[in-house]
Amino acid sequence: MIKIRMGVAAVIAAVAFGCVTAPGEKAAGDFTLATFNVRCPADKGELAWYRRMPRVAQVVRDHGFDVFGVQEAVPSEVKILEAELPDFAHVGCGREADRGGESMLIFYNRDRFNCLTNETFWLSETPDRPGSRYTGAGCPRTCTWALLEDRVTGKRFRYFNTHLDHISSKARWNGMQVLLERGVRPAKARGETIFLTGDLNETLDKADDPAAIAALHGPRLTESAKENPIALVSTELKDTYGMSATPHRGTYKTFHGFKGTPSCRIDYIFATPDVKVRSHATLNDKPGGQFASDHYPVAVTVGL
């Protein structure tokens, strides 16, 4: 059984910095999965990448992540995460033609999981061509997936991690179509347990209304909602926000732009209905009083 306990100092720090505390204990067989846009190296001072990556790792440790997907991570950032998180292995590659640049890596605790196979493909009309993109997309976009086997329970699941385009709504829609057609639907047809995480650069509507998100799980999709990649993925998977057995913790919205007050919910964790979601949280941590990224990570504790 994996147990996570917070000491007195950690509790004091949590109160001081207004963060969402980690669960006191995980039941045998449960694990914590998360999505974290770690922000590319585009800032200076306290927000510089080499200052922020240790904070990212601190969030991972504080909340007991067992497996998580990152977005925007470049090789220099990954190198720090590797040093800070020696118990973790990762799979995936960069999005550019030379497989460099920003990556959508999947990190997993090597003591907890075996990676049986993995792949990165491009969200384009030619998914096997590195660096390819849809017309109108601001940059190449990818999906990395891994078939993981839990060393505790022996159960397997397929984990997809992605980052949709920030410029073109059409590219976001098309990209999700590729991801579902190439990855999710075949895995579902085989009866596999699936997780999909990522920064989708999209909300259901401009109001960013939780009730509207919840409506995706019923028969009330409108034609306008069907044009949204969130609605599209929700035809295949469920938003874990609405699956949690306990109330959501932390802010509903996830992107805060280093301001601390998030403006929209664009970071998601989806899963197949067989997943037992124990908790769902947006982690509003500020390790040492400083931001780790311009996005707050989202984490779920689950059982299979």
Where are the model-predicted features located?
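Structured beta-strand-rich core segments of catalytic domains in phosphoester-bond hydrolases
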Residues: 67-160, 164
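Metal-dependent phosphoester-hydrolase catalytic domains
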Residues: 170, 184-195, 202-304
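N-terminal, active-site-proximal structural segment of metallo-dependent hydrolase catalytic domains
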Residues: 8, 12, 16-84, 95-102, ...
